């Protein structure tokens, strides 16, 4: 893992943490020094619990913002898990393999899909599939980042989470449980002026 300094559009590598281990991150903070650590106002991290604990301990005054990329990755993994389960289920029941070779149709941003992927996605979304429900929930979640008001963003997040928990899609529900555990850290994105991600 890498540690960067990001100031008003400037990005500078501060250090490389050896592997994904707590000891490595603790060593980074020790080497970085207490004085410099005290000057850190915002830190951007993923949701890995050991890192969150170290950041809370070593940077108690810093605002921890969850990285949008990691949240999007976890959500995409949940959608893909729904897709994989449904591929197996449809195969077992003897249906045509419509979801085969469609993985990236559900994982890529809509604007990054090729014409062929757009056609395949349009064809697939005509069916009543669990994968489609997961995909539409994923697309709807993107609206969270567009809010300017933290209060409205929190309202949206809670509504989206409640709707997703009713979806009967276990991988999506697991993602929601993770989000709910970190709701305050997620909302820090707005406290930080939507500039860190």
Model-found features: residue ranges?
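Two-metal-ion RNase H-like nuclease active-site motif
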Residues: 1-4
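Acidic/histidine-rich catalytic cores and adjacent linkers
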Residues: 7-12, 26-27, 31-63, 69-73, ...
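Short alpha-helix plus adjacent loop in nuclease-associated cores
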Residues: 71-92
